[in-house]
Each structure stands twice: as C-alpha cells, then as structure tokens.
Amino acid sequence: MNSVDAIFKMRVMTYNIRHGKGMDGQTNLRRLVEEIAKANADVVTLQGVDRFLPRSGFQDQFKKLAKQLRMHSCFSPSVNLLIFQYGNAILSRYPIISKEIKYIGGSIERRSTLTARLQIGEESVTVLNTHLGVHTKERMKQVPILWDALNKLERPAIIAGDFNMEMDDPLMKQLNSRWQKIELQNKRPTEEKSGEIDHIFVNMPIEQASAWVQPSAVSDHYPVIAELRWRLDN
C-alpha cells in the first residue's frame, strides 16, 4: 500500500485453496504458490488450508506458503484434532501486529473468523477472513456471530472470504447494507457449481476500486482479486 497525497493503494486476494487440490484431482503446493504469487497481492486471505493432514501429504501448508511467498502470516484452525489442523490463513506483506480468532460453529465442521491488524507505516488496517458453512441452517447461526465481530471493527477494515452464498441471498443482503461489496468486473462464478460465493467488502469510503476473478485450475474455487484506493483521512 502506497501513500501519495494521503491516498492508499492495496491489492487484496481471497482464495479457497481446497488444500491445494486442483480440478485434476491432484494436490500440488508448488503450483498453488505460483498461482498466489502471480496475483502480486499485498494481502491474501486463504480458506481450506491444511496442516499435517494425510490428504495433503502431512505438509504444513500454512508455514510452507508463508515461507515460499515471503509474507507475514497468521492462522486460525477451524478444525483441530491432535496435530491435524484445517482452517483460514492471512498472508501479508506488512507486519501483523495483532490477531484474533473467533469460532462461529458449524454442524458439519467448525468454522472460524481470523482477524489481523496490519501495520503500514504509521497507519494500520484490519483484515477479517472467514469461511461460512455450506448449508443455509449453518449460516443462519453463523452470520449473527460474524455481524457482531464486524460491528466492532474500526475503519479502515476489509472482510474477505468464502461466504458460500451469492449476493441475492437474504443473509448477504444484510452484509451489503452495511459494508461495500467490491463488484467483479468480469462477472463469472468464483466456484463453478455454486456461483459467485467468494467476496471482498470494505467499511471505508473508496476512491477507486476494481475486482476480478483470476482463471485457475489449482483449486475448485478461483482467486478473487481487488485493487483498492482510499484516503487516509477516511
């Protein structure tokens, strides 16, 4: 993020990586690293990250991604069983000065939100990453907890993740009434079977914004990337 005449610029990526399992059924962390690096994002919110699970070769995907991409990082284990973990991660070019994990429940698997405060020069920005449940009944219980967390965030803040809902869902309309959705320039699904379910929102007035889907076969989701510009005094 650069400051010129009090205008900041940040590129954000959100990506459900499905533990690196591509559309060809193969799990490959190397090509996932290449996919993320190609976006040249300042901040990356990841969902579906494995740590030490057999299905992904017992790799610590979180640590490997952070190391190979040379980014600051934090992790929230939505599922935590012995040494096996699965959850959300935030990667950042900027130092992470604090983080908070909130568990929001789930009938099939537990879900979480991961909030990180990033230090950018003398300023800071909050990023919240989440992955909501697949079924409507799950999300109806999770969304009020998420709303409570969002209401406590100061400006400027960004929320990104896999919401498992398109924008016409009543629950998403609630969020869109309070936060600004960064609309996709190339309208297309972010997951072929479910539609546009991966989103990026902000709570500050934006000078300029654009978002797009990056074509990819590295996961069953596509990366969503947003370019944001806002004024420091907002």
Model-predicted segments: where are they?
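Active-site regions of metal-assisted phosphoester/phosphodiester hydrolases
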Residues: 1-43, 52, 67-68, 72-75, ...
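Short strand-turn motif at the edge of the Rossmann-like AdoMet-binding core
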Residues: 49
